[in-house]
Amino acid sequence: MKRFKRVSAVVLGFALLFSPLAPQTVAEAKVVWGNQELVKGQIGRVTVLKNTNLYNIKNNKLVAARKVTKGQVFRVYSESSKFGGLYGVSKGTYAQKSSSIKYEKAPRDKIQALGVTVTKKSLASNTSYPQVSGLINKPFEASYNRKFLNIAKEAQKEHNELKEQEKEDRKNGWAPGPYSRNMTYSVPYNQDNILSVAVTNDAYAGGVHGNAWIDTYNYDLLKARQISLKDIINNNTKLNKVNNYIRNEMIARNKKGAQFWVNEFKSVNVKDDQFYYTSSGIAIIFGEYEYGPYSNGIHTFKIPSSVYK
């Protein structure tokens, strides 16, 4: 039987306060295309080459809405073949395809840099997982989705095994509470063609308390590859700076009531430690019993990029 224990609601709540599942304010991606910022939902732009009109559609007819002059540029959010070709520049307002305008489709990598679509899927109420769409690299998109589906299937399999074990334990007079294995996720970073997913797990199979842990997955969507912490902290100088930053942060948190065993912290493990991207750098996660008692829970240390660059 797998070594699962019950997660205390209080401790897990404290742990998640510092985890990727805690409410976060993530800055919107800023993507510049030429001299104009690309925005969510934009598919292209039209440049006015000669003075012309923008149009509305009324009673299935094009009606001039306002005049536009040479040099003006408008974001395009939709494209239609009606009336010889229309480009939606705002709600109900269109530029008509003609020699008076030039249409340019936004580069796919620029659109992807604004953030891909992540959809929540569930195998059961206790197991949810992410599926992505909108990636340029479709084989990679399919591979990504299979990976997280398989992770979810394994979690649900473990849950089902625990429920069977619970039945056996109850027959033998031992089952202090419902056994379970839960999985959910958050997306702490989704911009600049980087996607970070944090999978939060907890499990209980009897005992005083259970286990909670976070697995993170970070991807370079343009290169279609997973990013490791070693890719970011790639030399001893950077590693020493990050270690010093975390050590000082532990000391500061201890003054506010945390119980980090600062002397036991020697270094970040760039091969195994979990991390995710933030708008200002990265965040490194330490699990239960890492550098502190169980009551410390799961802790996240946000490292500004200025520390390791």
What are these regions (language model features)?
Residues 16, 94, 132:
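Hydrophobic pocket-lining residues within nucleotide cofactor-binding pockets
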Residues 28-110:
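Beta-loop motif signature
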Residues 24, 57-58, 97-98, 135, ...:
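Surface-exposed loop/turn and secondary-structure junction residues enriched for glycine/proline
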Residues 1-28:
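Sec-dependent N-terminal signal peptides of Gram-positive bacterial secreted proteins and lipoproteins
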Residues 24, 41-43, 49, 84, ...:
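Sequence-level motif detector for i,i+2 pairs with an aromatic at +2
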Residues 4-5, 108-309:
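Compositionally biased intrinsically disordered regions enriched in Thr/Gly
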